[in-house]
Amino acid sequence: MPLNSARMNDYRLVLGDKELKPIMVGGMGVNISTRELALEAARLGGVGHISDALTADVSDRLFGTHFVKDKAKRCAPFSGLAPKTDMEFVPEEIERATHLCVEDVMNRKTGDGLVFINCMEKLTMNDSFKTLPHRLNAALDAGIDGISLSAGLHISSFAMMAENKRFRHAKLGIVVSSVRALNIFLKKSSRTGRLPDFVVVESPLA
């Protein structure tokens, strides 16, 4: 087909048993890729991403929760001290915030597309790895269509979700920058008996 006559509707993105328009957008945080962007992509039949970066802050803005204020009060005694290793969110708070953000988006979703969450292994927060299983499983429990794993090797992420009832039903993928990183992820994740539904390659040679 000549490129000058090609249209988006001439192509399809297939993830498992789901056929989609070739649109995959979003994932930037904090709330840069908004729920509105993700919902519009899904309405059009593609894939829209929300971000899991600082869901506590996003939840406070959207739903009137007080996760950030409560953390500030709790960590006030450590203000001015370094290192700030004790200034962190309680994992259960991150779990609740993630659940609220995802549930809200999924309740609003229309169209034949999907809404994913971009889940980063490394975040600019103390001990982000400790919150990772809470973030992953909260998103699944809240009904997210899929998860894109990014910002890290995620060698434990599939294992963290393996007992979740939606682990084998949600679309799960990984963002990598090299074949080496992908091979490491596949080797570790294969122990769960589950392979990723998709791989996103981002690098100068992609």
Predicted regions, residues:
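Active-site entrance/lid segments in N-terminal catalytic domains of soluble metabolic enzymes
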Residues: 1-206
